[in-house]
Curated annotation (Swiss-Prot):
One of its GO terms (biological process) is trehalose biosynthetic process. The gene is TPPE. Induction: Not induced by trehalose. The keyword Disulfide bond does not apply. This is Probable trehalose-phosphate phosphatase E. Keywords: Hydrolase, Stress response. Its EC number is 3.1.3.12. Pathway: Glycan biosynthesis; trehalose biosynthesis. One of its GO terms (molecular function) is trehalose-phosphatase activity.
Length: 354
C-alpha cells in the first residue's frame, strides 16, 4: 500500500495527461519555468480574452441543460444503455467475482441543488446504501471534503474518499470488509493544505462581487460553484478565478457540473483513489473482483477510464443528457441509482438465502 502511494504522488503530472478530467488552466505567470510551463503557454496563446472565452465555452459544455437532438441522444443511449434495462447482463459479467461498490455523492446519491450545503440524501437512499454496504465493500468517492460528505451520508461502515480521492479513510465501525486492526488513512496532498487555505480565502474575496457565486473549502481542493450565477456573469467569474490561480503554479483548474475545481498538480484523482481502495481491500491485481463505479461528474471519468482500460468491472454515468464518457452504462438520476442499488441488494440477499 505504501509503495502504491509513493509511486503515484512523488511525480508531477505529465503535461499532456494531467488528468482525464479536462484541465482548463494551470497556475503560474508566463515566465514560470516549472514543469507546467508548456501547458500554461498553450492556454495563454490567445491571451486573456480568448482564454476566458474558452473557459466559458467549456463551462457551458460541461453543464448541459437540454438534450441534444433525438438522433444523437438515441445513439448515445445505444452506446451507454440503462443499467436498469441491462441489469441481467451486468450480473452475468460479475458472475463468480466479488463486487465492490464506488459511489459519487452529489448528483448520484443526492440531487443537485442550488445550495451545496443543503445537498442532503433521502432517508430511503441512506437505508439503501446501508443495506448495500452489508452485501458489498462500499466506498463514497466525492470532490467534497471528507468530513462534509461523511456528515451527509451518516454511515460509519463505509469507506470515504473526499477531495477527489485525496483524503481517504476506512470504516470507523460496522464493516465486515474492514481488515482486522486496519486503520486506513491516505492523504497524498497534505503539503498543499496551507496553499489551498490561502487560495480559498482569496477566491472568497475576489468573487464577492459576483451574485450567486459560492466558494467551498474542500480541504485538499477548493470549489467555486456557479450554479446560481447568471450566465452573462460567467466570464467575470472566470476572470476572477484566473486572477487568483495565475499566482500558484502548483495548482490546476478543472471543472464539473456548474463548479470550477482548484486542485494540486499531483498524480492523484478519483481513479487513483479507486485503485488504492481496491489494493487496501486486498483486490489489487485480482481477476475475481468486479468494481462498479457510479458517478455523474467529469471528475468521475478518471475512475471510469481506469476500469475501461483494465477491462475490469464497469462504470455507470448518471445523466439525463448525452455526454462523452468512459462509462459503459447510464442511469438518469439519483432515483434510478437507488433502484439499481436496491436490485443489487435483493440479488445478493437471494443468493445468500437471506
Amino acid at each position: 500500500m505504501v509503495r502504491f502511494i509513493e509511486e503515484n504522488i512523488t511525480k508531477m503530472l505529465e503535461t499532456k495527461a494531467i488528468s482525464n478530467s479536462e484541465v482548463l488552466y494551470v497556475g503560474g505567470d508566463d515566465g514560470d519555468t516549472s514543469p507546467t510551463t508548456k501547458v500554461l503557454h498553450d492556454f495563454q496563446i490567445n491571451s486573456g480574452g480568448g482564454l476566458i472565452r474558452s473557459w466559458v465555452d467549456s463551462m457551458r459544455a460541461c453543464s448541459p441543460t437540454r438534450p441534444k437532438s433525438f438522433n444523437s441522444q438515441s445513439c448515445w443511449i445505444k452506446e451507454h444503455p440503462s443499467a436498469l434495462n441491462m441489469f441481467e447482463e451486468i450480473l452475468h459479467k460479475s458472475e463468480g467475482k466479488q463486487i465492490v461498490m464506488f459511489l459519487d455523492y452529489d448528483g448520484t446519491l443526492s440531487p443537485i441543488v442550488d445550495d451545496p450545503d443543503r445537498a442532503f440524501m433521502s432517508k430511503k437512499m441512506r437505508n439503501t446504501v446501508r443495506k448495500l454496504a452489508k452485501c458489498f465493500p462500499t466506498a463514497i468517492v466525492s470532490g467534497r471534503c471528507r468530513e462534509k460528505v461523511s456528515s451527509f451520508v451518516k454511515l460509519t461502515e463505509l469507506y470515504y474518499a473526499g477531495s477527489h480521492g485525496m483524503d481517504i479513510k476506512g470504516p470507523e465501525q460496522g464493516s465486515k470488509y474492514k481488515k482486522e486492526n486496519q486503520s486506513l488513512l491516505c492523504q497524498p496532498a497534505t503539503e498543499f493544505l496551507p496553499v489551498i487555505n490561502e487560495v480559498y480565502k482569496k477566491l472568497v474575496e475576489n468573487t464577492q462581487s459576483i451574485p450567486g457565486a459560492k466558494v467551498e473549502n474542500n480541504k485538499f481542493c477548493a470549489s467555486v460553484h456557479f450554479r446560481c450565477v447568471e450566465e452573462n456573469k460567467w466570464s467575470d467569474l472566470a476572470h476572477q478565478v484566473r486572477s487568483v490561480l495565475k499566482n500558484y503554479p502548483k495548482l490546476m483548474l478543472t471543472q464539473g457540473r456548474k463548479v470550477l475545481e482548484i486542485r494540486p498538480i499531483i498524480k492523484w484523482d478519483k481513479g487513483k483513489a479507486l485503485e488504492f481502495l481496491l489494493e487496501s481491500l486486498g483486490y489489487d491485481n485480482c481477476t475475481d473482483v468486479f468494481p462498479i463505479y457510479i458517478g455523474d461528474d467529469r471528475t468521475d471519468e478518471d475512475a471510469f477510464k481506469i476500469l475501461r482500460d483494465k477491462k475490469q468491472g464497469l462504470g455507470i454515468l448518471v445523466s439525463k443528457y448525452a455526454k462523452e464518457t468512459n462509462a459503459s452504462y447510464s442511469l438518469q438520476e439519483p432515483d434510478e441509482v437507488m433502484v439499481f442499488l436496491e436490485r443489487l441488494v435483493e440479488w445478493k440477499q437471494s443468493r445468500c438465502g437471506a
